[in-house]
Amino acid sequence: EIKVESPKEANAKALDILNKGIDSLSFHVKAKELNAEYIETLLNDSCAECVELNFSTCQGHVVELADLLVAYFQKKDYDLTKLQGSINYDFFNKMLAKGKEKGNMVQTAKALIEATAQLPKYRVLNVNALTLNNAGAYISQELGYALAWGNEYMNQLTEAEIPAAIVAKKIKFNFGISSNYFLEIAKFRAARMLWANIVASYNPECLRDCENKGPNGECRCAAKMKVHAETSTFNLTLFDAHVNLLRTQTEAMSAALGGVDSMTVVPFDKTYETPDEFSERLARNQQLLLKEESHFDKVIDPAAGSYYIENLTVSIAKQAWEIFLAVEEEGGFYAALKAGTVQAAVNESNKARHKAVAQRREVLLGTNQFPNFNEKAGDKKPVEATCCCGG
């Protein structure tokens, strides 16, 4: 992930990273600087057909960003049907974090879908369940609320007369990855199964010839969940920070075995300073080791057939489905957010997990298990959150 302070510097960094084996990039761009020249400078010499490009900016400027990207891709004569990427628009995440609405979801979502109509593989409606994970939610909570989150997009936009297949193909799930190795593998497997069932309930019809067209004309590819995963910051520690490398490595392994489409490994020092070239290189190489040396990307579902993981998958699916149904009974994810139900449940989990760590019922290596009592914090201070605009 690249936070863009200068498009020229960000471009140089992106090209350097691409030459080191990465095939998916994410840019956090400043909304107030957006224009055609900015995009051209940022993406100069990047082959958009060879790499997945993901973007995020202030929610009020996502349509402007989409228009600029489409214009740039057309200018470069790319085959727009082959380009893959996303624009991180998430109306509900803002409500979850700030407790207030900003803009009109249906209006903005429709404009985004129309703006990216020529980019069929670009996802522009995001479910940032990562926020729940980083706030301390349990695995079943993260998955259950994520499903309700995605279903809220489906429900509201199909009511606005947008075909279900189009809506489903524009949704992207961004999950967090905790240190529960086997449970996380099971979570991603359960997520795909449950989401497919939810989408199928909307009877998405194929709008054109499709290889995955079902016997009744349903679009099977619409039911496929697009998943990005990011290692959690909830368990990253300021003390004995290099132990964070152990946590992020096992988290990346579980996501890869769980079958995610892409992942971000958070640098081990992100909680107390701006990651430098060293920590970013380590984070990048943690992924490349799994791909290039362990070949985790060569098997579709390596956990399939494992009695333990199959049972965990069913168990997590049941728990998450119960949470999903409870949210739907309350009127849907939007209603639950306005009532504060989701926030209250996650806050309770956060308190319970902190208490468990304090009582050593939840192990945090290097903190409550085998701590270094001689280590001092020094200049280390927790990094404060910043606005999504980059300000």
Name each model-derived stretch.
Residues 261, 319-391:
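Intrinsic disorder at enzyme termini
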Residues 80, 159-170, 201-224, 262, ...:
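Flexible, glycine/charged-enriched surface loops at secondary-structure junctions
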Residues 21, 77, 195, 258, ...:
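Conserved, mostly hydrophobic/aromatic
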Residues 1-180, 184, 210, 256, ...:
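Catalytic alpha/beta active-site cores
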Residues 55-58, 101-113, 241-244, 320-337:
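Phosphate/diphosphate-binding loops
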Residues 151, 155-159, 169-177, 189-239:
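Accessory "access/gating" subregions that flank catalytic or transport cores
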Residues 137-143, 178-190, 232-245, 273-283, ...:
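Short glycine/threonine-rich loop-to-helix capping motif typified by GTGT followed
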Residues 120-155, 249-304, 308-320:
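Mobile "lid/hinge" segments at catalytic clefts and subdomain interfaces of large enzymes
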